[in-house]
Amino acid sequence: MLILTRKVGESLLIGDDISITILNVRGNQVKIGVNAPKDVSVHREEIYQRIKQAEEKESTS
């Protein structure tokens, strides 16, 4: 795992077309902004897990 340190307003790039910007830090919460092409899905991990579980449930029905 790559670990990076960023300050508010700073960004990191993934490939040529995805950027993640730190928008705000308050206590133990970090607000980030993600710029990605429309064909790239961006989800919080817990939402992604629910989507995958629903897909698995549909495929076994």
Curated annotation (Swiss-Prot):
Keywords for this protein: Activator, Cytoplasm, Repressor, RNA-binding, Translation regulation
An individual GO BP term: negative regulation of translational initiation
Entry GO CC: cytosol
Lineage top rank: taxon: Bacteria
Subunit structure and binding partners: Homodimer; the beta-strands of each monomer intercalate to form a hydrophobic core, while the alpha-helices form wings that extend away from the core.
Entry similarity comment: Belongs to the CsrA/RsmA family.
Protein name (database record): Translational regulator CsrA
UniProt organism field: Mannheimia succiniciproducens (strain KCTC 0769BP / MBEL55E)
